[in-house]
Structures are given as structure tokens and as C-alpha cells.
Amino acid sequence: MAVLGVQLVVTLFTATLMHRLAPHCSFARWLLCNGSLFRYIHPSEEELRALSGKLRPRVRKERWANGLHDEKPLSVPRDAHFQLQTCPLTAVDALVLRFFLEYQWFVDFAVYSVGVYLFTEAYYFVLGPVQETNIAVFWCLLTLAFSLKVFLMVTRLYFSTKEGGERSVCLSFAFLFLLLAMLVQVVREETLELGLEPGLASMTQHLEPILKKQDWDWTLPVIKLAIRLGLAVLGSLLGAFLIFPGLRLAQTHQDALTLSADRPLLQLLLHTSFLSPLCTLWLWTKPVARDFLYQAPTRNMTFSVPSEGAFDSLRLWVLVALCLLRLAVTRPHLQAYLCLAKARVEQLRKEAGRIEAREIQQRVVRVYCYVTVVSLQYLTPLILTLHCTLLLKTLGGYSWALSSTPPPLAPSQPSEALIPVDPAGDEAQQTAAQVAGILGGLLTPLFLRGMLAYIIWWTAACQLLSSLFGLYFHQHLAAS
């Protein structure tokens, strides 16, 4: 309580509130099961039997008399005309779905994490505490960890199938994105201002005096190489995680545009949401964003060019707005996915021959049973990007205010003060202080700016590439 004070009380209150309100009030459940989404119900066996022209014998004696003691599975013509009934998607129906509880807990935790962050921002703005730890950082870091866990949980489904097609796609794109991640790191800061080079330089400046005192200065190049390799591996994992969500997003985007043919405003929002990763890439492309804004010919127009700090704040606001826009069009995408059941049945009618009734029912049910996985694939990249943006503002020393002067970074502590010089002190305390000094020299604001900006930019790049590949796949490869 003495260390965190009000923030600890708010954290405990939020955790209790999340636990108590989950059965009664849940944003995740409202987003999916408020009644605006509808699902298709598969035809019953009696309906399909009536379409096939075969009536089921009612008594066992009659079945033996007709030689049906070894009854074959019911089959119907593929072009049989039957209607799929619809019903609203309710919470009672969703409780039996796989990963629904994980989906509800993860999305609700992300919402409460944003709530804690908003409170701490208001708390720091009003009171301005100096010696308190910002507990919203831990909430955001936990949300990032849970996002990676959800990615692993969903991607593991593709590795557990008997067919190796999905597994091969994940591994192939993981290798491709590994190469691209290494190429991105060698792009000059004049082109892509992610801040990796200034961040590594700041880390080197702070760590070098500490490592020299311990005769560990030879590890400095190894640390820099390990950081770059770690970023490349992280980029490869994110690429493998986002390839199938990108393919799914491309399909639901096309279907959502078809369903909203008479709603031009919704189509505009869908197009803007689909291209939002491209806007994120532009925000860190210096010739496109910053240089164009500062060096564009103004002619007779009079307007004030934003400062460096104002541009950084504007970039944060744009990222938050793009995340909210993608959240706003969640239901059109989910409804477009649920309508795949009808599309699969209509595609079945174009084929010749017969098909088992059970397979027809499975084609319809599989779409509904997979809706929570599709929801996680859609929302997890959004949650990851949003919380990285919040961390970028806090740990990177930025400000939400579009002020004319950039906010000053916190002064760095001298390296001599990070290591105790009292020889009579406890050896364990000295070791802990040395580790804290190394971590303090490593996690500088400039370094954290570069790391978080890289994650945000790379997530957007993976989403854009995978969704564009999905458009090409569904329009050309899948059709053929």
C-alpha cells in the first residue's frame, strides 16, 4: 500500500469487479451474443429423409422385413432444395462452443486493462505522483502475454489436424516473415523511423560503464546481436500467428461488403478498417509521413506545422482511432463468417451426385462451432496493437497532448549510482543491485520506444501482407 497506494486499491477493486460481474455483465458476451448476430440451423434428419423420398420404417419388425437390419447412412441428392432456418446467437448457445470461456475472459480482461490505464492516466494528470509505480504498465504487459497465449492456443489447432496443409502454411510463412523481419532491421532510420538504432545506442551508452566495471564489456556486442535475433524470431512468430487470421479477415471482408451492398457508409468503414494496417505502416515511414508533412509546398495556405512532439502524439491518437474503428466493424465481419454456412450449402447444390445427410449437417454446424475461434483471430491483433500503443505512450515518455514541445524524457541515473560501492554490504544485495542496474541501463525510454514501435509496425505489416494474400487466394486460387 505504501508503494502503490491508490493504484493498488484500484487494481484490487478492478480484479474483484471483473470476477463478480463476469457472470452478469460481460463486454465479450455482449459483443457476440446480444442478439444482432444470427446463425443457421442445419436441417433435421427427417427433413432430409423426406427430400430423399425414403421414409424411415417405424418399427424394428418392419425394418427386418424390408431387409434394413444393416441400414446404410441416409444420403440425399446434392441439389436437394431445403431451407436453412436462422436463429439469434445467444449466450446459452455460445456456452457450449469451444474456447468461448477463454474468449470471454481474455476480451473482458483487455477491457478492464484499458479501464485501469485510463484511471492511472487521469491520476497522473491530476496529482502527478513521482515515486509511484505505474501499475497500468503491468496490466498492459499481462494483456500482451495473454495475447501471445491466445495466438499459441489458436495456432495449435492447425498443428493438431491430420492433414498437414495448415501446418505447412504456418511453417512456410514463419520462415518468410523471419527473412522479412531481418530485412526490416537493416532499413535506415531516414526511411523507417522505428527508433531501433537510437534505442540500441541509448542502451549501449548506459550499459557500457556498468559492464566495464565488471569486465563484461565483451558481452555488449553479444547483447545487441541477441536483441536483434530476438526481434527477428518474434517477427517470425507473429507472422505465423497472423497468417490464418489474415486469410480469414480477407474472406469475411469480401462477404461483409456483399452483405452491406445497400449500406455505403458501412462499406466505407469496412474498407477503411481493412486498410488500417497500411495507415499504420505509413505513420513510421518517414518520407511519407513526417517529411511530407514538414516539407510539403504550402503555396498561399497558412497553417501551423505540428512539432515533433505533436506529431508523435498525433501518431498515438491515430493508432487508437484505428483500433476503435476495427472494433466497430467486428459484428459485420462475424456475421459474414456465420453466413458461410448458407454459402456452403448453395455451393453444394451446384454439384452432382449424392451426399450423406450427416455431412450436410456437419457443414452447417462447423461454421457455428468455429465462431469463437474466428472472434479471437479478429480481436487478438487489435488488442495487441492497442496495448502496445498504450505502453508506447507510457514507457516511451510520450504525451497525449498535441503540444508544441515534445515531453522531456526522464533523466537517466548515473551508472555509478546503480551499483553499491559499500564493501560491507550484503553480497546478495550487491548482486541484486547490479542486476537492477543492468536492467535499468537496458530498458531506457529510447530503447522501449524502438521495441514497442517495432512490434506495432510489424504486427500491422503481417496483417496487411496476410490479408492481401488472402484476397488473392480467395479471388483466384480458391475459385480455380
Swiss-Prot record:
The keyword Glycoprotein applies. The keyword Nucleus does not apply. Residues 120-134, 188-224, 285-304, 392-450 are cytoplasmic. Glycans are attached at residue 34. Residues 29-98, 156-166, 246-263, 326-370, 474-480 are extracellular. Residues 1-28 form the signal peptide. It is found in: Membrane. It is a multi-pass membrane protein. Keywords: Glycoprotein, Membrane, Signal, Transmembrane, Transmembrane helix. The chain crosses the membrane at residues 99-119, 135-155, 167-187, 225-245, 264-284, 305-325, 371-391, 451-473. GO terms for cellular component: membrane. GO terms for biological process: cellular response to oxidative stress; cellular response to UV; negative regulation of intrinsic apoptotic signaling pathway in response to DNA damage; positive regulation of DNA repair; response to retinoic acid. May play a role in protection against oxidative stress. Overexpression leads to reduced levels of oxidant-induced DNA damage and apoptosis. Belongs to the TMEM161 family. This is Transmembrane protein 161A. It comes from Mus musculus. The gene is Tmem161a.
